[in-house]
From Swiss-Prot:
GO process terms (BP): chaperone cofactor-dependent protein refolding; DNA replication; protein refolding; response to heat
Protein name: Chaperone protein DnaJ
Organism: Burkholderia lata (strain ATCC 17760 / DSM 23089 / LMG 22485 / NCIMB 9086 / R18194 / 383)
Lineage: Bacteria, Pseudomonadati, Pseudomonadota, Betaproteobacteria, Burkholderiales
First and last residues of every CXXCXGXG motif repeat: 151-158, 168-175, 190-197, 204-211
Subcellular location(s) of the protein: Cytoplasm
Length: 378
């Protein structure tokens, strides 16, 4: 049976780049992998076909020969470039699944074949509590973070001074071993050296063979103005160190904003509850309110009711990605006086009597409410 065109097998154009070819291979290899399709001969054949196409098109020399001469250019029986056979499934997935699943398939998150596996260090998380004012204006601070550093006794080798790590006898320094089971040959992380390619016969007593010890380091952290609760700041390279020369992880500083005694934040806007005397609500006047930038005042019209909201533009918080500050919403609460003197009581009674003489025009909300109640019972 004639072989299908390699580009057709992978579903890519003839001018496809290396990244596009690799992406297509990943997708198809995962789809037809025998582990996902047990006892499925068609899937097995598709998998072999996809693997062969990728082996040819991912190699610059073979691809050039194939583009010029077709299958004859890469068929060893035709004197061309020659295929290298299929080998085990581990070869097909050593790079692909290693990129997708990290250590789960082949042991290494990064790194090439034939040597100790290289691992990126783990990320660290640090929770930090700040005030609303600090979140609004931003500030620089220092944090103390527990972290791993190279052991000073063994200089990071993990071996007792005077000794040194030795090549792992199980994997012979490769960091991986092949496990054969029937039709499959699977590459796994070496169980003795855990992918390092070496083992330590006499561990350092200070670091117990890890080559690193824990200590607290001080880091500078810049809190940007406008940061919100739950946001994270990334400090690149300040996570745990990598293994076998792998890159370090990152530190993520998670921000939590303390509850404020006056303001509640809603995005870039602020809200506050403002009690005002009933006389100010009735007669109107100027009231003063706090803001994060100081004090501000605004007029309250006469006849203001409790629960009325006033909007002060630009008195909120300037967001991280905005040059315009949010607004401050002031919710006024009309305060009823308490602990009245006899004279004050008499004055209020006279005032109440004068309101009754004026009819419903002094209390429009009360009239509206009583009218609704009356219609409800009718």
């Amino acid at each position: 049976m004639a072989k299908r065109d390699y580009y057709e097998v992978l579903g890519v154009a003839k001018n496809a780049g290396d990244d596009e070819i690799k992406k297509a291979y990943r997708k198809l290899a995962m789809k037809y992998h025998p582990d996902r399709n047990p006892d499925n001969k068609d899937a097995e054949e598709h998998f072999k076909e996809v693997k062969e196409a990728y082996e040819m098109l991912s190699d610059g020399q073979k691809r050039a020969a194939y583009d010029q001469y077709g299958h004859a250019g890469v068929d060893p029986n035709m004197g061309g470039a020659g295929a290298q056979g299929f080998g085990g499934f581990a070869d097909a997935f050593g790079d692909i699944f290693g990129d997708i699943f990290g250590q789960a398939a082949g042991g290494a998150a990064r790194g090439g074949r034939g040597g100790p596996q290289v691992y990126r260090g783990a990320d660290l998380r640090y929770s930090m509590e700040i005030t609303l004012e600090q979140a609004a204006h931003g500030y620089d601070t220092q944090i103390r973070v527990p972290s791993w550093v190279s052991c000073e006794v063994c200089h990071g080798s993990g071996a007792k001074p005077g000794t040194k790590p030795e090549t792992c006898p199980t994997c012979h320094g490769q960091g991986t071993v092949r496990m054969s089971q029937g039709f499959f040959s699977i590459q796994q992380t070496c169980p003795k050296c855990h992918g390092t390619g070496t083992y330590i016969p006499e561990p350092c007593v200070h670091c117990h063979g890890s080559g690193k010890v824990k200590e607290t380091k001080t880091l500078e952290v810049k809190i940007p103005a406008g940061i919100d609760d739950g946001m994270r700041i990334r400090s690149a390279g300040n996570g745990e160190p990598g293994i076998n020369g792998g890159p370090p992880g990152d530190l993520y500083v998670e921000i939590h904003i303390k509850p404020h005694s006056v303001f509640e934040r809603d995005g870039d806007d602020l809200h506050c509850q403002m009690p005002i005397p009933f006389t100010t609500a009735a007669l109107g006047g100027e009231i003063e309110v706090p803001t994060l930038a100081g004090r501000a005042s605004f007029p309250v019209p006469e006849g203001t009711q409790s629960g009325k909201t006033f909007r002060l533009r630009g008195k909120g918080i300037k967001g991280l990605r905005s040059s315009i500050a949010g607004d401050l919403y002031v919710h006024v609460q009309v305060e009823t006086p308490v602990k009245l003197t006899d004279n004050q009581r008499d004055l209020l009674k006279q005032f109440e009597k004068s309101l009754a003489e004026g009819g419903a025009r002094h209390s429009p909300q009360s009239k509206s409410w009583f009218d609704r109640v009356k219609s409800f019972f009718e």
